[in-house]
Every structure is written in structure tokens, then in C-alpha cells.
From Swiss-Prot:
Gene3D superfamilies: Leucine Dehydrogenase, chain A, domain 1, NAD(P)-binding Rossmann-like Domain. GO terms for molecular function: methenyltetrahydrofolate cyclohydrolase activity; methylenetetrahydrofolate dehydrogenase (NADP+) activity. It comes from Trichodesmium erythraeum (strain IMS101). This is Bifunctional protein FolD. Pathway: One-carbon metabolism; tetrahydrofolate interconversion. The keyword NADP applies. GO terms for cellular component: cytosol. It catalyses: (6R)-5,10-methylene-5,6,7,8-tetrahydrofolate + NADP(+) = (6R)-5,10-methenyltetrahydrofolate + NADPH; (6R)-5,10-methenyltetrahydrofolate + H2O = (6R)-10-formyltetrahydrofolate + H(+). The gene is folD. The lineage of its organism: Bacteria, Bacillati, Cyanobacteriota, Cyanophyceae, Oscillatoriophycideae. SUPFAM superfamilies: Aminoacid dehydrogenase-like, N-terminal domain (SSF53223), NAD(P)-binding Rossmann-fold domains (SSF51735).
């Protein structure tokens, strides 16, 4: 019988632990943690993600210092806001919600964030510390994957992990974290040939490509662990909108030993890791 990796339940547990930590340290520090999420424009999906993050902040006791800017906001204006937040002692974490309008350079803005407040873990300083195996703020989605695997006591050492996708958000930091855990890592991508032959060798298969239901049961090794990072909105036969992953869940669940659902798998874990990074950064003020 396939075991479901319940990211939603684990995220709830993590948030409860973070809430207790905030309550216990708030008197010593003199204020709650503060997270500033910057959103530009009116992308509906981004709006949903930002509201989810703000709701999660409230549950844990983090002050949400979010700012919403009109679409025409300039690069210089956003840069000035980031510099002010870098200097603001009430702000522990800064996050720029992606995607941004086309006239804005997200990489340039990311570089302007103080690395110690980069709770998304995407600043070159934090990615460099990951590469070197040093402590630092970790990218939220791959960190959430690792935490979920740890919770279910899934052995990583010596296992062959295949990652589909090479983005700086998921694929590349995911590979580094798995290497840190002594896995043997293969990264496949849009130019990889004979994909099924690659995925069939995976003890742990992690998909982050954004292609609805591309992974079939025939592509999965019996007994594998399947982590579906993909979040795709599709229209079903009845004309209703629904969220699906990169994996054909029902058929792959017949083959895999463990599998994450979409929704309810990695999505909640990503938010939980964002909150954890924010609280951890804030808690250093005690020391």
C-alpha cells in the first residue's frame, strides 16, 4: 500500500512549534518577528499566495509587513523600498513575490536584499553557503522537501535521487541538499534524452517542471519515493478549474511506496519553511 506524504499535516505541526517559540522568546526580544512580502501588480495567483503567507504569519505570531505596489512601479522605487526594509530593525525577513511585471529585473532586486533577511534563501550569499555546506538560510521549497522526507524517516544516504527541473528555485538547490545527505543525484531537464530510462532508475523521484500529469506509472520504479513539486492549474472535462501536479497521482500511487499529493504536499511545506526561516533569523536577536 502506498503511503501518502502529508505535507499539510506536517506544516501544521511546524507552525504550532514556531508559535510556541515566538511566544517564549517575544518577551526577551521585545517584539514579534516581522516579515515583509513585496507584491507588484495584480497577478491573481500571486495574490492567493501572498494572502496564504499572510494568514500563516498570523497563525504563528509573525507580524506581516507586506506591501502591494501598482504594476507600473519602477525598478528604482522597489530598490528604495528594499533598502529601507534592510535597515528597518522591525523586519527580519524580506521576500519579493514572483513573477514580477516584465519591466522589472527580479534578479537585480534579489541581489539588493540583505542576505541575512533573505528568508526565501535565493540570494547568492545563501546559495553559496549551501554549496559550501555551511549554515545559512535555505531555499524554502527544497528545504520543505527535505523536512518532509526526514519526518517520514526516508533513507537518503546512498540512494539514487532523480530531479526533474534545474531551476534556481527548486532543482539546483534540491540537488545540493540531497548531495549533502549523501544521495547520488541526477538532474534531468527539457533537453534530457530518454527521460523514462532516467526516471525508472530513481529511488527518489522529485518533479518540478510545471507540466500537468507528465509522469506516468510506467516512468516510475516500483517502490520509489515520488515527490511532486509541480503546481498546475487545469480545466477538467466539466469545465472546472483544479490544481494538479506533474505526476499522474492515482496510477503512480499504485507503483510508488511514498507519494506527495497536489495540493497538500509540498505547497504547505514551502510556506512552513518560509515561516521557519523568519523565526530562526529573529531568534538570533536573543544571542
Amino acid at each position: 500500500m502506498t503511503n501518502k506524504l502529508d505535507g499539510k499535516a506536517l506544516a501544521k505541526k511546524i507552525k504550532a512549534e514556531l508559535q510556541q517559540k515566538v511566544q517564549s522568546l517575544q518577551i526577551k526580544i521585545g517584539r514579534p518577528p516581522g516579515l515583509a512580502v513585496l507584491m507588484v501588480g495584480d497577478n491573481p495567483a500571486s495574490g492567493v499566495y501572498v494572502r496564504n503567507k499572510e494568514k500563516a504569519c498570523t497563525q504563528v505570531g509573525i507580524t506581516s509587513l507586506g506591501k502591494h505596489f501598482p504594476t507600473q512601479t519602477s525598478q528604482a522605487q522597489l530598490g528604495q523600498v528594499i533598502q529601507k526594509l534592510n535597515q528597518d530593525p522591525q523586519v527580519d525577513g524580506i521576500l519579493v513575490q514572483l513573477p514580477l511585471p516584465k519591466h522589472l529585473d527580479s534578479t537585480s532586486l534579489l541581489y539588493q536584499i540583505d542576505p541575512s533577511k533573505d528568508v526565501d534563501g535565493l540570494h547568492p550569499m545563501n546559495l553559496g553557503q549551501l554549496l559550501r555546506g555551511e549554515k545559512g538560510l535555505r531555499s524554502c521549497t527544497p528545504a520543505g522537501v527535505m523536512r518532509l522526507l526526514q519526518e517520514y524517516k526516508i533513507e537518503l544516504q546512498g540512494k539514487h535521487a532523480v530531479i526533474l527541473g534545474r531551476s534556481i528555485l527548486v532543482g539546483k538547490p534540491m540537488a545540493l541538499m540531497l548531495l549533502e545527505a549523501n544521495s547520488t543525484v541526477t538532474i534531468a531537464h527539457s533537453r534530457s534524452k530518454n527521460l523514462e530510462a532516467i526516471t525508472k532508475k530513481a529511488d527518489i523521484l522529485i518533479t518540478a517542471v510545471g507540466r500537468p500529469k507528465m509522469i506516468s506509472a510506467e516512468m516510475v520504479k516500483p517502490g520509489a519515493v515520488v515527490i511532486d513539486v509541480g503546481i498546475n492549474r487545469v480545466i477538467d472535462e466539466a469545465g472546472n478549474s483544479q490544481l494538479v501536479g506533474d505526476v499522474q497521482f492515482n496510477s503512480v500511487a499504485q507503483v510508488a511506496e511514498y507519494i506527495t499529493p497536489v495540493p497538500g504536499g509540498i505547497g504547505p511545506m514551502t510556506v512552513a519553511m518560509l515561516l521557519q526561516n523568519t523565526v530562526e533569523r529573529w531568534s538570533t536577536l536573543v544571542e
